[in-house]
Regions:
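Carbohydrate-binding surface patches
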Residues: 327, 333-336, 341-343, 379-418
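Structural recognition of the beta-strand scaffold that forms the well-ordered cores
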Residues: 49-55, 84-91, 133-138, 186-191, ...
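Gly-Asp-aromatic-enriched flexible segments
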Residues: 458-638
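C-terminal beta-strand-rich structural cap/linker in extracellular carbohydrate-active enzymes
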Residues: 437-461
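Glycan-recognition surfaces
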Residues: 242-345, 366, 379
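Aromatic-lined carbohydrate-recognition surfaces of secreted/lumenal glycan-active proteins
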Residues: 132-149, 163-164, 226, 230-261
Length: 638
């Protein structure tokens, strides 16, 4: 949640044994060694992105049982529940105090009458009886975001200093047991302001009303974030969730707003992970939040999704007077496999917006079981084309006009990785109109509009699939980044928490140089020794990719050092493993040398691993390309 707060590191007496154990394990293990294991997060219940409603955008801390049950009832009555919207999430503002001396959390009975006899169980029972699930909010630190930035908010926790410490810090097992075993919640959002905003120099701490907690997160500086400490606390949270939910029926939301390089590691610690600061109901904030996730297609998978924040449809630039923008917002979030969490006051939301939330054809793209986030097939400042491969073999394409002038965009078979000489059918998922073309067509896109289509055609790769078509099955277990750097491609909005004070928003979300589909880590076209590759994976040297194989029998690629590399000296060796066994290995390859064809029989292997190894250089100066990397259904070479 709110992320204009400053974090550094937290006292770690309780974490030291865990950190030492983790460090010892890491030191004893070569991160490039094959594991025959899919390492991205698969616990909990998020094989498809979660859908539902959250209280924050509409109400902030001014929440009560009537408002939340009103939203739940509208979700059921409107048919949205039947379409997959099932989580009803209470955000910040519910906690009254931490009772002393037993440290048990108490809700606000004046706002939530059903809690008057000791807790939320009657509330969650009612939601469950409606066929819905219930979510609750907490923070990594002692205190929450509203306490850090809420001013004189009357809805803040009450009582002594200790009673007002309603965050998880020091109470992880107790609180999670309370939330899940005793109160019956299903969804857990964990914010990070409590480990960011309460340093000794904080005005809040200086008042004497809050205890100091040395920060471990800094939104503006990944270098000042203590990433191992944050990861250690999320590990403890995961362990507690598993103990309290032996059936695995939970969903964990990481909300550290893209800070601390979480865009790289969040996929290993939770079901959804925020890639940016909070969204706001302004067009420029949509662009910022979109950009924080749109080039992270290899970092979102079934069970661990990128989260550019909640839908803000229903307010500002996305209200009922801005249906073009509202439809774009919904279409883009669906293509990104973002959680579809509405944030409007659904009791008064116009039917036109309910109809947007309820577009079943677009929901189907978001909930497609293949779990492939859309990949940028065309990437420019004013127009983008995003393509998603579906489990059925169909495609989806979104043509997004970011700007203020209409565009007649060229959509080609190459964008879609379909044959140029065969008919291609487009079904507009808003108008439901069908069109057919061969090779290429024009798509008229109004300002701020997203034209979104389901696509049927003949695959360019008839007997297989390019790895870049199935990012949901490709995990950069080790992406080669050694020094996380802020990503300069994220749009810098003027509508941040400080408005136009200061010098403007600067790049802040680490992830620059991460693995990419159909692109180098730094946004260049894939190319080895002058030969371009329209399909492939770009990643840094000293990296390891995990690939879920399915029933494919062969893998092929052309490998080499990408032409964009600044390191013209050091060699890279490429290896293919199947279930931990070395299947193929290249000769050492340097910049300027032609690509080497590398292939292997992977029939029967569940996990294929692609390793690019080098010594002596700087990974960030040595991007490599797995050109045309594809899984094939035939054991014969293409």
């Amino acid at each position: 949640m709110q992320a204009q707060r400053t974090l550094r590191r937290l006292p770690r007496l309780a974490l030291i044994p865990l950190l030492f154990a983790t460090a010892a394990t890491h030191a004893a293990t070569d991160p490039l060694a094959p594991t025959a294991h899919w390492s991205a997060y698969t616990a909990g219940r998020a094989t498809t992105p979660p859908m539902g409603w959250s209280s924050w955008n509409a109400f902030g801390t001014n929440i009560d049982e009537e408002k939340i049950m009103g939203a739940a009832q509208r979700i059921v009555d409107s048919g949205l529940a039947a379409k997959g919207y099932r989580y009803i999430n209470i955000d910040d503002g519910w906690a009254l105090r931490r009772h002393q001396p037993d440290n048990r959390l108490e809700a606000r009975p004046d706002r939530f009458p059903s809690t008057v006899n000791g807790g939320f169980r009657p509330f969650t029972d009612k939601l469950h009886a409606m066929g819905l699930k219930a979510g609750i909010y907490s923070d990594l630190g002692r205190n929450t975001c509203s306490q850090a930035y809420g001013g004189d908010d009357p809805n803040l926790p009450k009582g002594s200093m200790l009673e007002r410490e309603v965050g998880l810090y020091g109470h992880i097992d107790q609180d999670i047991t309370l939330f899940f075993r005793d109160w019956g919640f299903d969804f857990f959002k964990v914010d990070g302001c409590g480990v960011r905003a309460y340093g000794a120099d904080s005005p809040k701490v200086k008042t004497g009303n809050y205890r100091a907690l040395k920060p471990v997160l800094d939104l503006e500086s990944v270098a000042r974030s203590d990433i191992p400490a944050v990861q250690a606390e999320f590990t403890q949270i995961n362990d507690a969730l598993k103990r309290s939910n032996p059936d695995g029926d939970f969903l964990l939301s990481l909300c550290v707003w893209g800070a601390g390089d979480v865009r790289a590691w969040g996929k290993n610690f939770g079901n959804i992970s925020r890639t940016s600061d909070d969204i706001r109901p302004q067009w420029s904030r949509l662009l910022s939040n979109l950009d924080s996730a749109v080039r992270r297609e290899l970092y979102g998978h079934p069970g661990s999704w990128n989260d550019p924040d909640m839908l803000f449809i229903g307010a500002g630039d996305f209200d009922a007077n801005h249906l073009v923008e509202a439809k774009s917002h919904f279409s883009l979030w669906a293509m990104l496999n973002s959680p579809l969490m509405t944030g409007a006051d659904l009791r008064t939301t116009p039917q036109a917006l309910i109809d947007i939330f309820g577009n079943a054809d677009i929901i189907a793209l978001n909930q497609d079981p293949a779990g492939n986030q859309a990949v940028l097939a065309y990437d420019a400042d004013d127009l983008e084309i995003l393509v998603k491969t579906l489990a059925s073999g169909d495609k989806a394409v979104a043509v997004f006009n970011r700007g203020f002038a209409a565009v007649d965009a060229d959509l080609t078979a190459d964008h879609l990785k379909l044959r140029k000489d065969a008919p291609i059918k487009l079904t507009d998922l808003w108008s439901k109109a069908d069109t057919t073309f061969t090779n290429e067509t024009k798509v008229h896109v109004a300002p701020r509009e997203t034209r979104i289509f389901r696509v049927q055609g003949t695959r360019a790769l008839a007997q297989g699939v390019y790895l870049s078509e199935q990012p949901g099955s490709v995990n950069p277990a080790v992406d080669g980044v050694t020094t996380p750097q802020a990503d300069p491609t994220v749009f810098r909005s003027s509508f941040g928490w400080t408005g136009t004070k200061g010098g403007g928003e600067r790049p802040m979300y680490a992830g620059w140089g991460g693995a990419r589909a159909d692109s180098t880590p730094y946004g260049q076209l894939l190319q080895i020794a002058g030969t371009p590759y329209a399909a492939g994976i770009g990643i840094l040297a000293n990296s390891r990719l995990e690939v879920r194989n399915g029933d494919y029998r062969r893998i092929e690629a052309h490998v080499g050092v990408d032409d964009s590399a600044r390191d013209r000296t050091h060699a890279v060796t490429f290896m293919i493993y199947g279930d931990g066994k070395l299947l193929a290995k290249s000769k050492p390859l340097r910049w300027g040398q032609p690509a080497q064809a590398l292939s292997a029989d992977v029939g029967g292997a569940k996990i294929v691993e692609l390793v690019a190894k080098s010594t002596g250089g700087v990974n960030e100066q040595l991007p490599v390309t797995w050109g045309g990397a594809a899984l094939l259904s035939s054991a014969q070479a293409r």
